[in-house]
């Protein structure tokens, strides 16, 4: 009787569900381990083979930790708000709730068929009002703390679609859907003040066990730089332009200023004769994405405003230009151009015949900008100074003139938090007719997303919620004042910022989570997910966590202690899997043909967990063959337990068994599952060669296999005569003294020629080695009739006899 995966997998999945095998108790006194997966967006396409890779890794660790006596929290949920469901609703007129519900059912079925040990009683869904009640509650805390504010922000407005698009939905200035023109236009938006936490987000990275590459991505995104704020007065205007620069020492080389086309001063300072050209340029640049505008390969463009600024240290007039390579979202949206020492400024100055003044010696500015170090020249009081000294001196001079100060700048922008969408958490704010605004009282949360059979763009740039009068219009019962609810909704990031906290106490209707439980479970011990979330999701979650820490809601400064990014599973030809290429592998098909255990084993055996590796049907077949070999070793054709498994130890497998326990334990700790599986294969090969298999070794092997292939693990454990699930059985231990052979083979040489090979106990003394060598029949023949001049014994290696 062969290994019937369909029967066995169904049997144990039912057993786990019926017995709630993986239900996590809040035993606050027990040592804990919190293993977290990045929860999925439940798309219409269902699970693909990339999902189970990370999920299998956390599941192996969770099962391993349970066997080590840990209280393990291993939950799963759904990041279910988001654009695809909204798009489906717009295209079909159907409510996204039903679409989302069906997708979740599919995902859940697929995940359960893979045998993951989740505690389904802790399942969360970001679209559940009992969940987003607390997302809204967190928003109110941010608002009360002054961290949520309304600002005019340029957005991607598509008149034809009557809606605002995300950057991802705009390709080359037109909408991805339909190819309609898209314009940048300012709109009132909710923004979160993440910049207030920039330094802490940067500094606390050092305390985390994260891949260095991810930490660097976050550091670069935050982009802390030290420099100066310089203020340039505008000629004949009661206004000035603030610039942030990391090189205030080059101020003597400034020959013009450049503003972003959206800068608030552009319209005010532009002269009459330049107005038309400036307006046209502003309109043209509104059709470009930030990426296009900052593309270094593209030809620089710009327009002179007709206005001039004054250099605060030289008193010279500097023409003010606008150019789209300067973004309003970075720094102050204004640049002091030093073309002699900046490549972009050099290119711009060369194109528009603007002066190029050298202020740092060492280059040839007739040919190109010099960006190296050198002595300052043509720089007044800075002449002769090196870079560092000159920067300090320049700031000193600016401060003395009241024209600047030392400043730290961040590339990080405040987080644009509102979306002009229906399918998201309603923002709990009311705008009153007297111009004030208030948050919805906490006791009235959740503010429910209204159900509607007509989800269509408002046409005004507001979300479709603006069409629903009974939602929008409110009256204050106490004062009779009229108000309008906020119609923007939260971004998909909101629900995923804090979901790991709700798993800790998912049914608490009085608070986000019980403080004692938070204290027990935080921080997350292991977080596994794709590298595509390296910056935004992790940064936003860390930001919210720090705010909640400051409010006394959570007890730790950081949410995720250890982070690991699994690699990507590619198609057979090393290409990314995609529907268009027709190379997507559906896990349902594999579970049906090979079994869930085979899929889990194969994805862990493909290579290192963080590597990008191509899918291979041969590799999949090989993994199945290994499980078949294991089955045949343990189970006879008639289904009975193999009589090779015995209660007496003949010591033949001592060494390989103990080596296997040691190797698998170490590899599970370091997430090197591929090499752990290799060692399990070595053990099985030796078992096939052995006369008998000591039953405790057979059981130990099954315990090590079970976290990777849990269904066959449970079945073999059961067939070995055990009554309980293998889930909470103690993890095997190894005996150091058995990691090496108890006997060694030594050679015996007579006059340099090998005459015998002996197996002797490892701890045999030199004297005993000599005696054993001299007793050997071959040795006796070789030294017969000769005088023994010398005997040299090297423990565990050889005995050399010199005889004449």
UniProtKB/Swiss-Prot annotation:
Keywords: Aminoacyl-tRNA synthetase, ATP-binding, Cytoplasm, Ligase, Nucleotide-binding, Protein biosynthesis. It comes from the Bacteria. Its EC number is 6.1.1.4. It is found in: Cytoplasm. It is an enzyme of class 6 (ligase). Belongs to the class-I aminoacyl-tRNA synthetase family. This is Leucine--tRNA ligase. The lineage of its organism: Bacteria, Bacillati, Bacillota, Bacilli, Bacillales.
């Amino acid at each position: 009787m062969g290994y019937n995966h369909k029967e066995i997998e169904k049997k144990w999945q039912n057993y786990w569900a019926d017995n709630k095998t993986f239900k996590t108790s809040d035993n606050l006194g027990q040592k804990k381990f919190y293993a977290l997966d990045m929860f999925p967006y439940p798309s219409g396409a269902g699970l693909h083979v990339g999902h189970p890779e990370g999920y299998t890794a956390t599941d192996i660790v969770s099962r391993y930790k349970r066997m080590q006596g840990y209280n393990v929290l291993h939950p799963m949920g759904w990041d279910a708000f988001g654009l695809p469901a909204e798009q489906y609703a717009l295209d079909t007129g159907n409510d996204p709730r039903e679409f989302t519900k069906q997708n979740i059912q599919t995902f859940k079925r697929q995940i359960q068929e893979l045998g993951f040990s989740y505690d389904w009683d802790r399942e969360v869904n970001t679209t559940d009002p009992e969940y987003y009640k607390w997302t809204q509650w967190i928003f109110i805390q941010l608002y009360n703390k002054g961290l949520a504010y309304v600002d005019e922000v340029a957005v991607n407005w598509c008149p034809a679609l009557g809606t605002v698009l995300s950057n991802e939905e705009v390709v080359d200035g037109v909408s991805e859907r339909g190819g309609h023109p898209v314009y940048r236009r300012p709109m009132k938006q909710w923004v979160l003040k993440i910049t207030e936490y920039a330094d802490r987000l940067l500094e606390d990275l050092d305390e985390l066990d994260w891949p260095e590459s991810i930490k660097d991505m976050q550091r670069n995104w935050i982009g802390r730089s030290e420099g100066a704020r310089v203020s340039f007065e505008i000629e004949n205007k009661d206004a000035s332009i603030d610039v942030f620069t990391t090189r205030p020492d080059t101020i003597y080389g400034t020959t013009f200023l450049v503003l972003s086309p959206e800068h608030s001063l552009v319209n005010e300072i532009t002269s009459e004769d330049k107005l038309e050209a400036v307006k046209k340029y502003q309109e043209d640049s509104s059709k470009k994405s930030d990426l296009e505008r900052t593309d270094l390969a593209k030809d620089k463009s710009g327009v002179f405003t007709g206005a001039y600024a004054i250099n605060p240290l030289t008193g010279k007039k500097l023409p003010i230009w606008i150019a789209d390579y300067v973004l309003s979202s970075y720094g102050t949206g204004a640049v002091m151009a030093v073309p002699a020492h900046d490549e972009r400024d050099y290119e711009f100055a060369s194109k528009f015949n603007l002066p190029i003044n050298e202020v740092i010696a060492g280059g040839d500015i007739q040919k190109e900008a010099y960006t190296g170090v050198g002595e300052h020249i043509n720089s007044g009081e800075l002449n002769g100074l090196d870079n560092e000294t000159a920067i300090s001196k320049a700031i000193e001079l600016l401060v003395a003139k009241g024209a600047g100060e030392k400043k730290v700048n961040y590339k990080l922008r405040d987080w644009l938090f509102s979306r002009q969408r229906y399918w998201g958490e309603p923002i709990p704010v009311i705008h009153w007719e007297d111009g004030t605004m208030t948050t919805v009282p906490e006791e009235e949360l959740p503010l429910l997303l209204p159900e509607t059979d007509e989800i269509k763009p408002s046409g005004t740039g507001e979300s479709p919620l603006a069409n629903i009068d009974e939602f929008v219009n409110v009256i204050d019962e106490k004062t009779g004042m009229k108000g309008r609810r906020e119609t923007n909704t939260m971004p998909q990031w909101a629900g995923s910022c804090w979901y790991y906290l709700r798993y800790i106490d998912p049914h608490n209707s009085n608070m986000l989570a019980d403080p004692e439980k938070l204290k027990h479970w935080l921080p997350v011990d292991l977080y596994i997910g794709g590298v595509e979330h390296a910056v935004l999701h992790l940064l936003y979650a860390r930001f919210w966590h720090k705010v909640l820490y400051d409010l006394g809601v959570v007890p730790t400064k950081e949410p995720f202690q250890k982070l690991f990014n699994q690699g990507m599973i590619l198609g057979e030809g090393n290409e990314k899997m995609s529907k268009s290429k027709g190379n997507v592998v559906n896990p349902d098909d594999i579970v049906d043909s090979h079994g869930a255990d085979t899929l889990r084993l194969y994805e862990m055996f493909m290579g290192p967990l963080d590597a990008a590796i191509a899918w291979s049907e041969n590799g999949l077949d090989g993994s199945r063959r290994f499980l078949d070999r294991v089955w045949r070793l343990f189970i006879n054709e008639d289904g009975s337990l193999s009589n090779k498994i015995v209660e007496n130890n003949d010591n033949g497998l001592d060494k390989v068994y103990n080596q296997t326990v040691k190797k698998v334990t170490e590899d599970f700790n370091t997430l090197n599952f591929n090499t752990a599986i290799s060692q399990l294969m070595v053990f099985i090969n030796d078992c096939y060669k052995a006369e008998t298999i000591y039953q405790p070794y057979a059981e130990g092997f099954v315990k090590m296999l079970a976290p990777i292939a849990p269904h066959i693990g449970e079945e073999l454990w059961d067939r070995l005569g055990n009554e309980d699930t293998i889930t909470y059985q103690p993890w095997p231990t190894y005996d150091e003294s058995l990691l090496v052979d108890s006997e060694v083979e030594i050679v015996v040489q007579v006059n340099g020629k090998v005459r015998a090979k002996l197996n002797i106990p490892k701890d045999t003394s030199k004297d005993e080695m000599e005696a054993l060598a001299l007793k050997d029949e071959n040795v006796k023949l070789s030294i017969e009739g000769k005088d023994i001049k010398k005997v040299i014994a090297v423990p565990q290696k050889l005995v050399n006899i010199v005889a004449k």
